Amino acid sequence: MAQHGPVLGIDFGTSNSAAGYLRDGKPHLIQMAPGQMTLPTTFFFDFETRQTLIGEPANQALLDGTEGRFMRALKRVLGTSLMHEKRQILNERVTFVDIIARFLREIKIRAEAETGLTFDRALSGRPVVFHGTGDRREAQAEADLRACYIAAGFKEVDFLFEPEAAAIASGTLDQSGEIGLIVDIGGGTSDFSLFRSGNDGVSILANHGVRIGGTDFDRSINIDRVMPLLGKGSTLRKAIGPGTTPAPNAIFNDLATWEKIPFLYTAQTRRMVEEMAQLSETPEKMNRLVTVLQDELGHDLAFAVERGKIAANNGANCPHIALDQIERTLTVVLPAEELAPILAVHAQALAGGATETLQLAGVTAKQVDRVIYVGGASPMVLLPHPMETLVPQSPPSFPQVFNPLNGGLALPPHPALRRTETPPPHLP
């Protein structure tokens, strides 16, 4: 990136976003709303006013039952064919590039209004992997994100791996030469950076990532606890002849997936579910699914699951998932001790990601001096943190989950950041 004009560091997240810039040599976070340094990465297209709402107003419109279309977790669509498909929303046909660009433009506008500066240059965080190591969609995902920034009004955009930004912001460890492992568990991906601190900055030894985040935790809880109440796992009578067949899992899996929910609200899907309800051996359950699609309650359910997850994680008394949007007294009890088995598969994947990071650097677990957790999903104490087993000797650190990442994006990456292609032969 050419060195001219101020740079706006942007953490465009799956669930929440933030921005910052360098002021008087120190990172300064932009206030997205009074007292709020983050902006929910959500959209609501109001059918009555024909307006597009972003952030908390979008969330509130959904909670208020305003007629419209809600969207969240669009970062997970980057790199897929859906990004460039035009669809009718309000009075125009738009792509997801257009929609994400509007969100980034709003961040740009708020930053310029607060600072009085013009930001033509952006340094954007990006996950180490969008979809998976070696996935053919990786290059396209970054190209899509770049296109969104350009469409938002930025003239130049560079990218920095999100865990590297957190490593920069974390600065040096207790002693020069110590090794730290950044574990960035975000809404849609989890990234790992192994770095070594020194008097002259931070050296990145290895980066790795897996496509697992907080929205996947929500999805697993939703599928395990909520979808059975809507007919998942039930049987349908065959339309012709005797016998039964299982209800198809695909619709329940999509309904539990944040970024796929809007695509279920079609006449074809509604007709299919109505036919399933007529053939169901448990029609009271399948009729709930009919209601969810007719009244477009998919995101309401997803938020209810998220609230229940947070309550269980925070040690609330009798945590539960309230489903009164469907039926007034419908509730799912969510005991904290039952979350670990539901999330076990994700814990295993995180352990694999951390192990692979160490192997890429040629570093053993015993050489790691500290594990630093960042990212919005990192405070999930009920998720069995595999690093506690992998590196039990390393004290964990939980700085504010967003500030380290965006602070690193606001700081200049050179000369503090260096990537070490081949680890030195004698690591401390």
What are these regions (language model features)?
Residues 75-81, 116-119, 274-281, 313-334:
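Flexible hinge/switch segments at interdomain interfaces of large molecular machines
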